[in-house]
Amino acid sequence: MRFWTSAAAAEILRRDEHVVRKLLNPRVYSKLVNAFSETETKLRSLCEDSNPQLKNAVSVFQQAVDSGSSLAFAGNNLMAKLVRSRNHELAFSFYRKMLETDTFINFVSLSGLLECYVQMRKTGFAFGVLALMLKRGFAFNVYNHNILLKGLCRNLECGKAVSLLREMRRNSLMPDVFSYNTVIRGFCEGKELEKALELANEMKGSGCSWSLVTWGILIDAFCKAGKMDEAMGFLKEMKFMGLEADLVVYTSLIRGFCDCGELDRGKALFDEVLERGDSPCAITYNTLIRGFCKLGQLKEASEIFEFMIERGVRPNVYTYTGLIDGLCGVGKTKEALQLLNLMIEKDEEPNAVTYNIIINKLCKDGLVADAVEIVELMKKRRTRPDNITYNILLGGLCAKGDLDEASKLLYLMLKDSSYTDPDVISYNALIHGLCKENRLHQALDIYDLLVEKLGAGDRVTTNILLNSTLKAGDVNKAMELWKQISDSKIVRNSDTYTAMIDGFCKTGMLNVAKGLLCKMRVSELQPSVFDYNCLLSSLCKEGSLDQAWRLFEEMQRDNNFPDVVSFNIMIDGSLKAGDIKSAESLLVGMSRAGLSPDLFTYSKLINRFLKLGYLDEAISFFDKMVDSGFEPDAHICDSVLKYCISQGETDKLTELVKKLVDKDIVLDKELTCTVMDYMCNSSANMDLAKRLLRVTDDKEERDK
């Protein structure tokens, strides 16, 4: 009996059935055959391609080996079936059962094991299987290596994949076109186009010709990288070699031109496809429609849509979604809703992306109630709203100031299983809304809830709260949040430092702000001009002009060039300190830096010179301001003209009024009356006074 149930008996029966038949009498032979045939017949039935029941087959196999049967052939066959069905976890588990029962494992099963390890992203173990094959005397083939190459590339280990290719050649196992295409695609997906092209040329040199797939991989990759000249060069080379690019290649090129905004060239390729007699598929049409919509060319997109229907190509969910997105992008929300209804009428079910586009537009338009109706429609049609849906709604409610409803929605997401669980973006939306409305205490409560549920927020969370706590003057809470960032895995970015520097400057804690700026400078993060300007402004306000100058000079040494705001801060600080010489040198430095004074610069200079009694200098800057195209505001005009009146400078007043009238610059009513009254009571030019009045009257007429 032991002989009948041994692994050896099973193998002998398989390989040498005629020998066994001669050695055993008919009764014994019949018993031996029946011992295996019943189980194996059942296994074959369970593994039939038409209706595979592989889990049941594994159970039957396990029961058979538990009862002492050896089913090596059936086991290896089942292993192959499991791998072919892509049920890799079950296949791996089954392989271990085969090992435990001492079942003979053949080459096919080891090949399947190799594929399992690759699918499980364990390429190191897959290499071990190759070694095991070699140890057992099996000659592994190109197919095994191709599986391994695919695994390496999927793990972004393309360098190892190239080494394996070369090792194959050294072992006289020539890589085939699939081998090369796998690694070329890996390099392309990793955006290493030069290496992909280098390997493709090496492929040619090894005597392995490029297939249409090779051309397609390269063209698609160069299109995605926006290198359209190179991609078109490949197409030209294909044509020169007598190869005909397929629709996939043309679609890649059309998409590339659409992504680059070159719709004309994309449309020309589309027309070329039609001229060749090919029928573009929905993907090709969708690519072109999306391209036109992206540039707001809805008329052209609609024409392609109509042409698509005329040609008998059924628009799919992506077609409608692209058009709906385009309509929403140009503010045509009503038309987008009509298209959504048409889509449903045509039995093309919208997906979550389709609904989210419309919900987002409605929320941006402030129509949150309408957006909620779309969410209800979504549920009614059995499309489950996702996190993006609810996050859009949360943002819409917060933007509208309906924070109580936003809070209710967040708690529903937490408690109701029909809703998705909130993510960090959900919490951030509500925290930001509460902070904007100065409800910091509630925002901090939501933050505590976030930490309880998710463990920690992200940089956006901390930046919002740091800004708000410092704005509210709650320095202790801000420092507590800063410490939490330090203790957590959240990486502080420049926005985090900016929030702290700005906040501490506004609360007058300049030493802390300076310390943060220094810390930022020695880290990998480069302080922005805004960071420097915050400190410069605060130092000037507290009268620390010397420190401000040192920081201004350090800023330039660090290649963080001052902007107009930086110069304005320093000019204003210098003028307030009575240092006119420094203010003038700053104006020169501003010009050398290629910057022009703005309205703020001129305002500060004019007002400061007037306070110092330097009317000529003030008028000089007033003239420069007007000549530069800036329209002086009411405050500047009031200051300069009233100063002229107070000093009895009739001629200078007349010159200024003439310049303003010539430029059609209108004074406010009160100042016009003051100037008119002065001009009437002095020897001023009355024609000019009338012109000033006419300009004011004309402005009033235009405003009616």
UniProtKB/Swiss-Prot annotation:
Keyword Repeat in annotation: yes
Judging by the UniProt lineage, the source's domain of life is: Eukaryota
Q: Which GO terms describe its cellular component?
A: mitochondrion
Where do the PPR repeats lie? 71-105, 106-140, 141-175, 176-210, 211-245, 246-280, 281-315, 316-350, 351-385, 386-416, 423-453, 458-492, 493-527, 528-562, 563-597, 598-632, 633-667
Q: Which SUPFAM superfamilies match?
A: HCP-like
**Record's Pfam families?**
PPR, PPR_1, PPR_2
Which pairs are disulfide-linked?
none
Keywords assigned: Repeat
Q: Does the keyword Repeat apply?
A: yes
Please provide the Gene Ontology terms (biological process) for this protein: mitochondrial mRNA 5'-end processing
Q: What protein family is recorded?
A: Belongs to the PPR family. P subfamily.
Q: What is this protein called?
A: Pentatricopeptide repeat-containing protein At4g28010
